Amino acid sequence: MSLDINQIALHQLIKRDEQNLELVLRDSLLEPTETVVEMVAELHRVYSAKNKAYGLFSEESELAQTLRLQRQGEEDFLAFSRAATGRLRDELAKYPFADGGFVLFCHYRYLAVEYLLVAVLSNLSSMRVNENLDINPTHYLDINHADIVARIDLTEWETNPESTRYLTFLKGRVGRKVADFFMDFLGASEGLNAKAQNRGLLQAVDDFTAEAQLDKAERQNVRQQVYSYCNEQLQAGEEIELESLSKELAGVSEVSFTEFAAEKGYELEESFPADRSTLRQLTKFAGSGGGLTINFDAMLLGERIFWDPATDTLTIKGTPPNLRDQLQRRTSGGN
């Protein structure tokens, strides 16, 4: 992985009671040792693989103002990180779920793009076996489950300030207003809505195949084509490119997909990030609620699975063997 750390700072927020978060600030930057580089590379990998929300700085963003000064050389990185940690503490203190943690600021370069990553990481306890085969307690940074993370694409921010996607952040777990306080800390507002773009793409694909008067099998083949392309982009860490997708769908209609999407006003960007959960709807039907979870291939609808919208009834012809076995054992037992 071609990742180079420019500067990295680490501070700590300690929760003493319900009202107070204590600041512990380093007096020097971290040295980019092999261990530190491995940690940042892992954080970069984990973060890049997660679904993110996109945003942009507001004109009043204090973080953006101080970051701009730091980039211009008017403030050093350590001072910037110390002041920002203080502001983060002030925002976190407003929320009862604030747990504290290690606050990381890392300015790094990956594949010719400069980033500033800000994360609050937790220390977890575990066990290890030492060289004498004794079991001892140990601690580790919980990178895989970090949900208070944001990343600024410094290259995009400085070369294309009108962009709505240079800032990304994790939404956090359901029920926690992680995004709320982090947006306040960053002084940012939500920008590109990747999920809405993906939903718009799905609608455009369905309408495109309908206008081309394709039969059911042909429509599903097109959906599979779209899913395969989008999934390949997702796995490669690349965005969905409408022009490239349109070339994949050449021959489906006399009108290209890009022309169709523009003419019908779907307001799709030329490129946008893939959203895994939304794209899955191209090939699957899935839903859960009220103790029921259903997931099946889209091609089965109308063949083995039938939906009656008038009665909201789903009829399944031919159950999976393992499910059938469970049903038979349960009913034969009189339960």
Curated annotation (Swiss-Prot):
<comment type="similarity">
    <text>Belongs to the YejK family.</text>
</comment>
<keyword id="KW-0963">Cytoplasm</keyword>
<dbReference type="GO" id="GO:0043590">
    <property type="term" value="C:bacterial nucleoid"/>
</dbReference>
<dbReference type="Pfam" id="PF04245">
    <property type="entry name" value="NA37"/>
</dbReference>
<dbReference type="GO" id="GO:0003690">
    <property type="term" value="F:double-stranded DNA binding"/>
</dbReference>
<protein>
    <recommendedName>
        <fullName>Nucleoid-associated protein YejK</fullName>
    </recommendedName>
</protein>
<dbReference type="InterPro" id="IPR007358">
    <property type="entry name" value="Nucleoid_associated_NdpA"/>
</dbReference>
<dbReference type="GO" id="GO:0003727">
    <property type="term" value="F:single-stranded RNA binding"/>
</dbReference>
<dbReference type="GO" id="GO:0005737">
    <property type="term" value="C:cytoplasm"/>
</dbReference>
